[in-house]
Amino acid sequence: MIAKSYFFPAVSSALIAALVVLLSHTALTAQFEVETTVEFIRDENGPDELSGITRGSDARWWAVDDRTGKLYPCRVGFDRSGSVEKFEVSEGVGLEGCSNAEGCAADPLRADIVYVSDEKSTSVTAHDVKTGKCVEKVVLPEEFRSNVRWNRSIEALCISPDGLRLWAANEDTLKCDGECATDQKGGTVRILVFTRKGAGAPWKFSGWSRYPTDAIGGKPFRNRTISGLVSLADLGDGSLLALEREMSRKNPLFPSFRSRLYRFRPAAAAGGEVAKELLWGDDVFFSNYEGMALCPADGGASRRLVLVSDGGGEAVESVRTLILKEN
């Protein structure tokens, strides 16, 4: 077994501004205290393109990468402030049928099952964490599958804390929904919801919401930009967190990465557009944050949100903790 360790010095960055977010009848006062630690991956044989991370109900962590299609057990340690101080990745197991894993979500009702979204095959499948064997396939709507764009397919994935709702979304606009995001206007993605009656019961497609993504903030870097929705997290109160990321050129020499965290409530009617509220946003230098995992409240008012960066291309691999304090 390989054990790759990333030890992070306690580096305090800043207190991000406190916001009062009104969503339906629920008021959320969110103050994010961000502590950033960055570590380059020096072992070329290690997983340097982590694209998704999840925390199981039994406190186990897993991550996926979009290069090898593997699931990696992880160990995450926090200091007293809630910032990540240790991140260990062990030998991964190949995921049957996956080659471009983007998102992952541990099943709250089955301890050894993790769901994975695969961009290349436009699929959501469940896997045994020990063997990688596919044990279930979630049936996606045909209109969704037949209209995805290359490298902009299904990306974000999460499951509600009670294990009865699964959410999945594409990264950028479907062909049937218009054009992709540009520096002039944002795009539109579909957030699909599936429901089930209990552990092991089949997932049933139960509707979708229209989610507007941000316009790109810069010009193409080396003739390309990256923009869209990359991760979701269910807060368990009827609302979700959405992570958007962007890569563009804002200076002559280097690419610029930007991350933004929004909160929204799914639309009441199928195909309705959601109203999103910005909680946090930052230019994150060379960190391409693609995956996030929400930790339980643990009896307190604070929630830890762990973000991982895909270290492929121009980006570096890093880990960041956002602490959401709800009063």
Regions of interest found by a model, annotated:
Residues S12-S24:
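Bacterial N-terminal signal peptides
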